[in-house]
A protein has these predicted regions:
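Conserved beta-strand positions in the central sheet of alpha/beta enzyme cores
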Residues: 55-57, 73-74, 98-100, 160, ...
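Acidic-and-aromatic substrate-binding clefts and catalytic sites of carbohydrate-active enzymes
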Residues: 35-38, 53-66, 76-85, 105-112, ...
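Short, well-ordered beta-to-alpha junction loops that form the rim of enzyme active sites
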Residues: 61, 135-136, 254-258
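Catalytic domains of carbohydrate-active enzymes, especially glycoside hydrolases
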Residues: 36-63, 90-98
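Structured helix-beta-strand junction loops
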Residues: 51-52, 127, 190
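Histidine-acidic metal/acid-base catalytic patches
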Residues: 2-46, 153-157, 167-306
């Protein structure tokens, strides 16, 4: 259900909370030596629960999980205003708690962008389905300036924060980092869902190490991208907590994609065969713990400000 704050609400009187889901695309094309046991359907969902995940984000055409022991949400793409209600109706019928969407292609002018956002907000309201517009390249939110303008026209808009698209796609570290974070405040304040993916300034998906307090070995350049993502995530979580109502839920879903679409980096092994850089399931488990640490830090900051 949709809260009066525009976020997903579980109907409880609980304080606003974080729930860590797993985007199911994270399990696609994993390395043969992955720590994921390649379980299917019910047994797979049981394993995810045992590993500490609290839900899953299904892909567009997955079937409903009527008997699965785990909550689920969805994702899709809305290219035109005419598609908005059809997409929302499909996911409401499947029983999704909420959905994230790629909206448009980034070629829309101001008027077309406004009509698309308005249609998405209308569909969300009519279907009682929270819809979070994803911050993503090749969409209407592909750059910071345009996304902030959307918040001025539609202050009720809510986002799925996938910040790697800005961090890498707009090379956030090139220039004044702090001023860019301040500019992003209207985005942070409207994040109701988060995709977990850490990028470097030049690569969309890079690895972290098991010691979440240490600089990753792959952060070999001038900056520590892990520290930057901790700050991005904590700011978004702080924005959520400042406006969330009782029962509101912020979903964080690791979405570490395979090398098939050039997200996971591939390197030759000793036999010359290309091999993914990391076990993406093991990385998702680290993200789970990292997200919870960031949320705890955001909650601490809220209390300090009260």
């Amino acid at each position: 259900m949709i809260s009066s704050s525009g976020f997903f609400n579980d109907g409880s009187a609980d304080s606003p909370k974080l729930r860590v889901y797993l985007n199911m695309d994270n399990l696609g094309d994993l390395r043969t030596d992955s720590s994921w046991p390649h379980l299917e359907e019910f047994s797979g969902y049981q394993r995810l629960v045992a590993d500490g995940f609290e839900g899953v984000q299904l892909t567009t055409n997955d079937t409903a999980l009527a008997t699965a022991p785990i909550p689920y949400c969805g994702l899709d793409r809305i290219n035109t205003p005419a598609e908005a209600d059809k997409v929302a109706a499909k996911h409401a019928e499947r029983g999704d708690l909420c959905i994230t969407v790629h909206a448009g292609w980034g070629l829309e002018d101001e008027d077309a962008t406004s009509r698309l956002v308005e249609a998405i907000l209308t569909a969300s309201s009519q279907r009682r389905l929270p819809i979070f517009i994803e911050t993503h390249r090749a969409t209407i939110t592909q750059d910071l300036w345009r996304t902030v303008q959307i918040t001025k026209v539609f202050p009720e808009v809510r986002f799925n924060g996938d910040f790697g698209h800005y961090y890498c796609g707009q090379e956030l570290v090139y220039g004044d980092w702090k001023s860019k974070l301040e500019f992003m405040a209207p985005i942070f304040d409207r994040v109701g869902f988060m995709h977990g993916r850490i990028a470097s300034p030049g690569c969309m998906q890079v690895s972290i190490d098991s010691d979440l307090t240490a600089r990753p070995r792959q952060a070999h350049g001038e900056i520590n991208y892990l520290d930057h993502f901790k700050e991005l995530w904590t700011r978004a979580m702080l924005g959520f907590l400042r406006t969330a109502q009782p029962g509101d839920v912020l979903i964080f879903a690791p979405e570490l994609l395979s090398g098939r679409n050039y997200y996971a980096r591939m390197f030759p092994n000793s036999a010359g065969t290309l091999f993914e850089e990391t076990d993406r399931y093991a990385q998702a488990l680290l993200y789970k713990d990292l997200a919870r640490a960031c949320f705890a830090e955001a909650a601490k900051l809220v209390k300090e400000c009260d």
